[in-house]
């Protein structure tokens, strides 16, 4: 089964994953085919079972493929919603491992990751409007604020996928109801 699942990825990504982690976890084996097929996926598993990579690796692989082909545009492809702004930096750090570890071809554009929370300085918010990241890490409240501004909507309109982390912590709260309205 491992071989079948890793065949969803480019050789560079599959080799990086195997060299770094060995074998995919059961969570990854179950999630990757659905995500690769563009199906909605709900990944629920204990801490340390590879949920973050199960959510991100398909998208990183596809963004790298676009970059290798010279087709990676300066626009947003993926939105990642974290329930806490304190987790946003952790997620960006977790993404550094595959983003820096998966070999790129010479001259290949780097995948850009941006964070937009209540702590993001105004100059960084303005830069994000002119030069959107490929992956945006944000909170439910910051997503809502972006949706209510013309410039924010112009950044968000190109997104092709959405990851909501820790959904169980939000679902039965006012923040969760607000988030569901934002992503509807």
Describe every region a protein language model picked out.
Residues 2, 8-14, 20-184:
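Conserved P-loop/Walker A NTP-binding site and adjacent catalytic elements of P-loop NTPases
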């Amino acid at each position: 089964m491992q071989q079948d699942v890793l065949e969803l990825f480019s050789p560079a990504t599959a080799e990086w994953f195997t060299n770094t982690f060995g074998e995919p976890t059961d969570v990854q084996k179950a999630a990757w085919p659905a995500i690769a097929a563009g199906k909605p996926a709900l990944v629920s598993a204990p801490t340390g079972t590879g949920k973050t990579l199960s959510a991100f690796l398909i998208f990183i692989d596809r963004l790298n493929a676009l970059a290798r082909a010279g087709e990676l545009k300066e626009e947003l492809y993926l939105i990642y919603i974290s329930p806490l702004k304190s987790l946003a930096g952790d997620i960006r750090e977790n993404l550094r491992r595959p983003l820096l570890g998966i070999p790129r071809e010479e001259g290949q554009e780097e995948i850009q990751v941006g964070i937009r929370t209540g702590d993001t300085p105004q100059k960084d918010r303005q830069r994000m409007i002119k030069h959107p990241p490929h992956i945006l890490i944000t909170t439910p409240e910051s997503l809502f604020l972006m949706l209510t501004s013309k410039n924010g909507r112009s950044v968000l309109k190109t997104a092709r996928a959405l990851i909501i982390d820790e959904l169980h912590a939000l679902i039965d709260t006012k923040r969760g109801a607000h988030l569901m309205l934002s992503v509807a």
